[in-house]
């Protein structure tokens, strides 16, 4: 992942030097499900996010960049049943933009946050580590009426594996989320697809 990663590192340094708050990288993640067993799964999800991110950094390290990125990686975990329980992605965009609960993680080209909903947390027992990524500038809209066009559309969100966190961050360092989230004919199709990223960062830059 980190081969030829100067673009991301230089972009990070620009952001960091412009504002002390930006001396870290990662994403804000909202938990919207609080049912039976979800506390344990939420904790496991956060631990796995760090584990998978570090694993990706190590496997694709170049010029010891992983050693620079690991100490400043953070998942800004937001878990508040009274505030976040069962919120829609659209409402979460408002929560993010209004900085409810404090400033979210620094944005890159697009203000993207992650979501662990009921499906995400329930799937952990099956070994599936999948969350939703959402662009806060484009609150998801309901597909009413159902589109008749067969052309693929961009919906402002998508599904991704935890191991893709550093890949998403790198992509967002130089491109907006329209190049990071899947395009589908219908919004419901997103429930059945995962974001695809190139295995070569020379292509992904």
Predicted regions located by residue number:
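Extended, charge-biased low-complexity segments
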Residues: 1-155
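Acidic, proline/glycine-rich low-complexity IDRs
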Residues: 139-205
């Amino acid at each position: 992942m980190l081969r030829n990663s100067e673009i991301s590192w230089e972009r990070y340094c620009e952001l960091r030097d412009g504002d002390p708050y930006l001396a870290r990288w990662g994403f804000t993640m909202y938990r919207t499900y609080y049912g039976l067993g979800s506390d344990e799964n939420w904790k496991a999800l956060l631990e796995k996010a760090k584990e998978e991110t570090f694993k990706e950094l190590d496997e694709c390290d170049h010029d010891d960049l992983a050693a620079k990125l690991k100490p400043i990686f953070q998942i800004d975990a937001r878990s508040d049943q009274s505030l976040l329980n069962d919120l829609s992605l659209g409402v979460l965009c408002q929560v993010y933009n209004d900085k409810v609960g404090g400033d979210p993680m620094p944005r890159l080209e697009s203000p993207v946050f992650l979501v662990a909903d009921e499906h995400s947390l329930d799937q952990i027992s099956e070994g599936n580590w999948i969350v939703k990524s959402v662009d806060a500038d484009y609150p998801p809209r309901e597909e009413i009426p159902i589109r008749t066009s067969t052309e693929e559309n961009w919906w402002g969100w998508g599904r991704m594996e935890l191991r893709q966190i550093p890949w998403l961050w790198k992509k967002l360092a130089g491109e907006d989320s329209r190049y990071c989230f899947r395009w589908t004919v219908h919004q419901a199709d997103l429930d059945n697809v995962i974001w695809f990223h190139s295995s070569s960062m020379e292509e992904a830059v």
